[in-house]
């Protein structure tokens, strides 16, 4: 038997230190994964807000271009127009086809079976044909119309929404419209 032979291998302390380092690394990776997932959700909510703001501006422009509304009607209700003053939940655009007017939410538009506006979430196969409608109940819209002069109006659409973390976020779009097509 040899005496004084040196043992090789890991000691218990070395194994514990390696375990702690590995645990800290894995916790950091899990945190980064969670933050990445949260960013995807936040960017999806921002994309919806941006699209709903564009939709409102397009409704105003289309109403002007097709003479659905007169130039004087392209105003908030307080100024003799048809667009609701203040903030309103996102609702289906009613019979006139224009958002943020008095008749919003009075008719069900496919695929939204209620008065609330919705988006279709893809089904299990990733296609919209078997998707389910998801109401946009955490979004609100405000259309503010300001007359710059008799031939020019400023339209500001603000979409406000609540994130999954409970934070209020908003997206605003401003454009100018004249009575000329």
Region locations from a protein language model:
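Low-complexity, Gly/Pro-rich coil/beta segments used as flexible assembly/activation regions
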Residues: 47, 51-181
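Exposed boundary/loop context
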Residues: 2, 18-21, 159, 168
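N-terminal leader/signal peptides at the extreme start of proteins
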Residues: 1-10
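Aliphatic-rich helix starts adjacent to a transmembrane/signal segment
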Residues: 10-54, 67
